[in-house]
Curated annotation (Swiss-Prot):
InterPro entries on file: bL21-like, bL21-like_sf, Ribosomal_bL21, Ribosomal_bL21_CS
Protein name from the UniProt record: Large ribosomal subunit protein bL21
Gene Ontology terms for molecular function: rRNA binding; structural constituent of ribosome
Family of the protein in this entry: Belongs to the bacterial ribosomal protein bL21 family.
Length: 103
């Protein structure tokens, strides 16, 4: 059994027991989160595809941790002008473990 749900503007394909990094959620570590924007649920031969969402579909997950991703370096450079700028960015994320998929 697996599902595709939407969180933080991105789509994630998950199955029970999977651990996924999502955009930062303002939820305490150890608490339970329910995602109701489910786009697809597949259970063996039965596949429920939403138009655009599956009615009554829900993905339940437990928050494992919060953190920051790898540093992304941005370099801006103007040729022949002795001008360059270097910036860095680390995106916050929330790591969740999928506990159940409800159709």
């Amino acid at each position: 059994m697996y599902a595709v749900f939407q969180s933080g503007g991105k789509q994630h394909r998950v199955a029970p027991g999977h651990t996924v990094r999502l955009e930062k959620l303002e939820v305490a570590t150890g608490s339970t989160v329910e995602f109701d924007q489910v786009l697809l649920i597949a259970d063996g031969e039965k596949v429920h595809v939403g138009a655009p969402l599956v009615a009554g579909g829900k993905v339940v997950a437990e928050v494992v941790s919060h953190g920051r991703g790898e540093k992304v370096t941005i370099v801006k450079f103007r040729r022949r002008k002795h001008h360059d700028k270097k910036l860095g960015h680390r995106q916050w994320f929330t790591e969740v473990k999928i506990t159940a998929i409800n159709a």
